[in-house]
Curated annotation (Swiss-Prot):
Reaction catalyzed: tRNA(Lys) + L-lysine + ATP = L-lysyl-tRNA(Lys) + AMP + diphosphate
Organism: Methanothermobacter thermautotrophicus (strain ATCC 29096 / DSM 1053 / JCM 10044 / NBRC 100330 / Delta H)
Residue ranges annotated as motif 'KMSKS' region: 292-296
UniProt GO BP: lysyl-tRNA aminoacylation
Superkingdom classification of source: Archaea
Sites where the protein binds ATP: 295
One term of GO molecular function: lysine-tRNA ligase activity
Keywords linked to the UniProt accession: Aminoacyl-tRNA synthetase, ATP-binding, Cytoplasm, Ligase, Nucleotide-binding, Protein biosynthesis
Name of the molecule in the record: Lysine--tRNA ligase
Length: 544
């Protein structure tokens, strides 16, 4: 009996170990596999109330990754994305003028394009997002909430909701302090007079005709088949699950609150529409520089903006490196370099180019990178992002010089060290050019001033102490005497500054002042090795 218990415990331990080695995306996929369905539909939805940012589009990235994990294991799955474009405009989004206040309460689908460049308000904000998704290789079945109504997909569910309004009202009242009125109906017509949908209330119906009143004073009726109205959100969400056959849906934590949208919609789905609620994946908000993202205040960062400064895999990494309910703050300024350091290290560990601190860390980082990958390929040619911020400023628009700087500083994979730029494959050139463009965009858009520099063509007018002058002379002599790596030069410079009784800050300040005319600059050893050797030697000797 003891042996039986031992083996059961051992098997359970091994099973839990295998489970723990999987990424949370894969563990969700494993749970979905237990459901008896022919195909998994992983849904996501976004309100088109302005620019679609990385905060309110998280569910699309999570949904796509779950569906990919299911497909990888041989299960049928697809990702759907619903544009909630039948919702009313509640705030004027940045940077639209105040004149758009006249559209408050009007469904997004009925608001004109703010710049006259698209057919509608919805297309204006939706198009850049869908174009960005293509770069992430996220393929979604796109549904328009407005078209779902006008095409009649909701008609049967509207009829059921009106007929069973007392039951739905009772479900809502379970979670309300003040009960809904006895004549309340879970449907809001679009006012025939003012065009608003959030100021109307339906109070009676007969067949497909609904009677309503609006705060503008209008009292009228409409046919539900016209599509000129919408179900109350929590009823609409439940209906949508059944219409699309949804089996899993990620959503923001506000919907996951006790007694919130998911709880109420789940009951309606099961008790009114006879459909099992989908597997929920709630996630925490992403803040921007510690501040909640807001379309109306212009505090947001879009997937398209991310692609200007980082590869698509890096946004996936940012989202998937921690559990969905863990708080995430994004800062595209100096902290972005730390994020890219972590991403670059994770990538190198995944491809076996660098060792992790432990087996546990290696497995964790490999899992994160695996679900972050856009496509399988050999080690991407992505030199250190942080180093590239220096190299790009030195090389300017000269790709040959940039490539030489990377090679001299051992920033290329070992197998490429003996190759010239024109010997790289098309894929390697594409990856290198992407990183160059990303880094240059970051320098232009987000880099603090102290990161930016320009090597001075002429010796700046500087005053240096005697120890600083001797330090520069000795570094010049050292560089003239032999070739060395950045690490070797770094160690030698510390020996020299100690010999002259200099603090590191004062010593390196002397280097920066004679080369770029500033007190601060990039890491000194790599910086010196990135410049033309003869120029550096002459400048450190104050000869040029």
């Amino acid at each position: 009996m003891k042996f039986t218990h031992f083996f059961v415990a051992l098997i359970l331990s091994r099973f839990l170990q295998v489970i723990s080695l999987k990424h949370w995306i894969e563990r969700i996929a494993d749970e979905l596999k237990e459901r008896d369905v022919e195909e998994h539909v992983v849904a996501s939805g976004t309100s088109i109330s302005g620019s679609i940012h990385i905060g309110n589009s998280c569910d699309v990235f999570i949904a796509s990754s779950i569906a990919k994990s299911l497909k990888k294991d041989g299960f049928k799955s697809r990702t759907v994305w619903i544009a909630d474009d039948h919702d009313p405009l509640r705030k004027v989004p940045y940077p639209l003028p105040e004149s758009y206040e006249k559209y408050l309460g009007v469904p997004y689908s009925m608001i004109p394009c703010p710049e006259g460049c698209c057919e509608s308000f919805v297309e204006h904000f939706q198009r850049p997002f869908l174009e960005a998704l293509e770069r992430f290789r996220i393929g979604v079945e796109h549904y328009s909430g407005a078209r779902m109504y006008t095409e009649g997909l909701y008609n049967d569910y509207i009829r059921t909701s009106l007929e069973r309004a007392p039951e739905i009202r009772e479900i809502f009242n379970r979670f309300r302090d003040r009960p809904l009125r006895d004549d309340w109906l879970p449907y809001n017509p679009i006012c025939e007079k003012c065009g608003r949908v959030n100021t109307t209330e339906a109070y009676d119906f007969s067949g497909d005709t609904v009677r309503y009143r609006c705060e503008c004073g209008f009292d009228g009726e409409m046919d539900i088949k016209s599509g000129l109205g919408k179900l109350t959100w929590r009823v609409e969400w439940a209906a949508r699950w059944k219409i699309l056959g949804v089996t899993c849906e990620p959503f923001g934590k506000d919907h996951a609150a006790s007694g919130g949208s998911y709880d109420v919609s789940s009951i309606i789905s099961e008790e009114i529409f006879d459909y099992p609620a989908p597997y929920p994946v709630p996630y925490e908000w992403i803040t921007l520089r510690g501040e909640a993202m807001s379309k109306s205040r212009g505090v947001f960062f879009t997937p398209g903006q991310w692609l200007e400064i980082g590869p698509p895999e890096s946004l996936n990494y940012f989202i998937f490196r921690s559990k969905p309910m863990k708080h995430k703050d994004f800062n595209p300024d100096m902290p972005f370099l730390d994020l890219m350091d972590q991403f670059d290290r994770t990538e190198r560990i995944y491809y076996g180019m660098e060792d992790a601190a432990s087996e546990k860390e290696e497995q964790k980082l490999r899992n994160i990178y695996r679900v972050s990958m856009i496509e399988e390929f050999d080690l991407p040619l992505r030199p250190s992002y942080r180093f590239m911020t220096v190299a790009c400023q030195i090389a300017g628009d000269d790709p040959e010089r940039l490539y030489d700087i990377l090679r001299r500083n051992s920033q290329l994979p070992e197998e490429l060290m003996d190759l010239e730029l024109d010997q790289l494959t098309d894929k390697q050139l594409e990856q290198l050019n992407e990183r160059i463009e990303n880094v240059k965009n970051w320098l232009r858009l987000y880099a603090p001033e102290f990161v930016k520099f320009q090597v001075q063509e002429e010796l700046p007018d500087v005053e240096l102490s005697e120890p600083q002058l001797k330090f520069l002379q000795d570094v010049a002599d050292l560089m003239e005497s032999r070739e060395m790596s950045a690490e070797e030069l770094h160690d030698e410079m510390y020996s020299i500054l100690r010999r002259h009784g200099l603090k590191p800050q004062k010593a390196f300040q002397a280097i920066y002042r004679v080369l770029i005319g500033k007190k601060m600059g990039p890491r000194a050893a790599s910086f010196l090795l990135s410049l033309e050797r003869d120029f550096v030697i002459r400048r450190l000797r104050l000869e040029a």
